[in-house]
Amino acid sequence: MKFKIIAGLVLVLSVIIASCGSQEDMEFKRYYLGGEQLYKQRCQNCHGTNGEGLSNLIPPLTDSTFLKTNKKQLACIVNNGLKGAIQVIHGKSFVGDMPANDMSPVDIARVLTYVTNSFGNKMGTVTSEDVAKDLKDCK
């Protein structure tokens, strides 16, 4: 009888613990889901539903080496915009200007978490603290 009670308690506790997830997982989900909504509102019109970009004007966000090698500059690009040609994939240039965005560091972090973990990218959570630090280093 005791064994059944203990086994039942262990099972219930296991289910509860498994359903909670870690603090990091929950933080990632909050940033990602918030970023998805912001992307749809502010970025999707140019970068596309699937991050495919637009011809030679708007660069794609799909598994872009640019995102991975310029992670520290992404907050600056989102915040300040970008003018002039940019080479993103395989030396291909894109000439469309990206406007500056009036977004808080936490909203920039949300968008970057979404973009850097969608469209074939898997780069983890970008926090508002990361963004605030990166914005101080904008050139």
Q: What do the PLM-derived regions correspond to, one by one?
A:
Residues C20-L38:
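Electrostatic cytochrome c docking/interface patches
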Residues G35-T49, V111, V115:
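The canonical Cys-X-X-Cys-His
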Residues Q23, T49-N50:
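Cys/His-rich metal-chelating microdomains
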Residues T65-N70:
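Conserved helix-turn-beta segment immediately C-terminal to the redox Cys motif
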Residues N56-T62, K83-K136:
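Axial heme c-ligation environment in periplasmic c-type cytochrome domains
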